[in-house]
Regions:
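A conserved ligand/cofactor-binding region detector
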Residues: 1-470
Length: 470
């Protein structure tokens, strides 16, 4: 027997022994507790952006997704653009139209990258202090940021996941309950791969009386609720709103954060500390919050859990590209409506400046027409695949002040995409001006409200400096 064969046999024996041990421990200590102690890495390749949102739903997992900001989608493996065609279109005349429409979107995207780069090179001249590599990377990132709205939600990507056995079980149960063929097929592939390394943790996923009942519960509840809820909202026109609306906050929230900060340094009951906070002057409360936040040297220095005492709920209308970035903040409470075309689309100024406006709008129109046709023909679940990322989607984000500090400071940093920078700048202003929590907003000292022309410039300079030190 050769060396590699011996290694594989030894590995298999090791897994079988571990599986036997886990099975015994599971029976003695309980499934859920033990399933938190083992983890696995998994790579999902060639999955649509619709599917990535399902994969990235769980809070207690780690994800790494291929970026549309830095990686151009210009290669054609096997002669086809990288997007997913829904299986339920097989045999339908709409399939050919779907392919033609998405091919046009990708053709337009790829064809305009050189022209948009040339436009930005003429608008933003290279500094003598920057290397050719830094300048080239900055211009390329700016062009891809501008054009990513042409990419459809069907665009495929690669996602890396890490999670415990318990987290993967929860993810797979949700995926098997989904109506989309792509999601369920991916779940089956994931289950097969994961059983190579953690079979005991996933034993009940496809057992009819265990995971099967769970899956039926998810699927049946979704269908029943949609049928019950639809009459209440169907046909109701959306009232006009801004891109960011603070729909929920506690007028006494800032006062309660002060009380929570005092609580940890006292031996007093919660309600008594709150009464003390009410008796403080606004200046005294602001000074106490400044002391609690401390001398923050960078955005990673965050105050303690007292900031979790008050929360903010934002209703957001943003392009799907920006939503994809903000949705990754999964520890807060976030949900979204189906992606469609009824809310219109964003149109970067550089598109018109570079002469691409007519083709941009043609792609938008074709995407909307295909989406509407898919809805009319009964492909409601698959219709979002046809929508390009410039179209806007409505979602809400509800987070406590500590989470808001993290999200808003991170997503307004100069290297961020202009779309989500603007969204988070509006959130920060709403906390101060609408909620009136000016002292809390003031502790978010690394929120950047500046207008940045070349978003990646400082970041690329920093990266080059780091590389030169190795």
């Amino acid at each position: 027997m050769s060396g590699p064969s011996i290694d594989r046999t030894a590995a298999r024996v090791g897994i079988e022994r571990a599986d036997t041990l886990y099975a015994r421990i599971l029976s003695e200590y309980g499934d859920d507790s033990v399933a938190q102690l083992g983890g696995a890495h998994l790579a999902c390749e060639g999955v649509s952006n619709v599917l990535t949102k399902v994969l990235e739903w769980g809070r207690l997992m780690a994800y790494l997704e291929q970026s549309t900001r830095y990686v151009p989608y210009t290669d054609k493996p096997g002669g086809a653009w990288k997007y997913h065609v829904p299986a339920d279109l097989t045999g339908s005349p709409l399939r050919d139209r779907f392919v033609r429409t998405l091919d046009t979107a990708f053709d337009t995207y790829a064809r305009w990258i050189p022209a948009i780069e040339a436009h930005f090179r003429s608008k933003y001249l290279k500094s003598p202090d920057d290397s050719d590599g830094v300048y080239r990377s900055v211009i390329r990132a700016k062009a891809l940021d501008t054009l990513r709205g042409l990419l459809p939600a069907a665009t495929t990507s690669n996602v890396g996941l890490f999670g415990t056995g318990q987290a993967f079980e929860a993810l797979l149960l949700r995926m098997f309950a989904q109506p989309l063929d792509e999601v369920r097929a991916c779940a089956q592939q994931m289950l097969t791969e994961l059983r190579e390394v953690m079979p005991a943790f996933l034993a009940r996923v496809d057992q009819p009386n265990r995971g099967g009942r769970w899956i039926d519960y998810f699927a049946d509840t979704r269908r029943t609720f949609e049928a019950v809820a639809r009459p209440f909202v169907a046909g109701v026109a959306a009232e006009p709103r801004g891109d960011v609306t603070l729909t929920g906050f506690d007028p006494d929230g800032e006062l309660k954060v002060v009380a929570s900060a005092l609580y940890s340094t006292s031996a007093l009951p919660d309600d008594q500390v709150l009464a003390i906070a009410r008796g403080m002057s606004p200046d005294a409360r602001a000074a106490l919050l400044r002391a609690y936040a401390g001398d923050r040297a960078n955005r990673r220095h965050k105050p303690g859990r007292a900031f979790e005492r008050t929360s903010y709920r934002f209703d957001v209308l943003a392009d799907y590209g920006a939503f994809r970035d903000l949705q990754r903040h999964r520890l807060l409470t976030l949900d979204w409506q189906p992606l469609g075309t009824q809310h219109g689309y964003v149109e970067p100024a550089a598109i018109e400046e570079a002469g691409a406006l007519a083709e941009w709008r043609a792609v938008m129109e074709q995407s909307a027409d295909l989406h509407e046709r898919m809805l009319a023909d009964g492909y409601r679940d698959s219709a979002p695949y046809a929508v390009v990322m410039a179209y806007r989607v409505r979602f809400y984000m509800e987070m406590n002040a500590r989470e808001a500090m993290h999200v808003i400071e991170l997503r307004t940093s100069p290297q961020g995409h202009p779309s989500y920078r603007r969204i988070c700048q509006l959130m920060h202003r709403a906390i101060a001006d609408v909620a009136g929590h000016r002292a809390i907003a003031a502790t978010m000292q690394f929120v950047d409200h500046s207008h940045v022309e070349l978003e990646r410039l400082q970041s690329e300079r920093h990266l080059e400096k780091k590389r030169s030190n190795f």
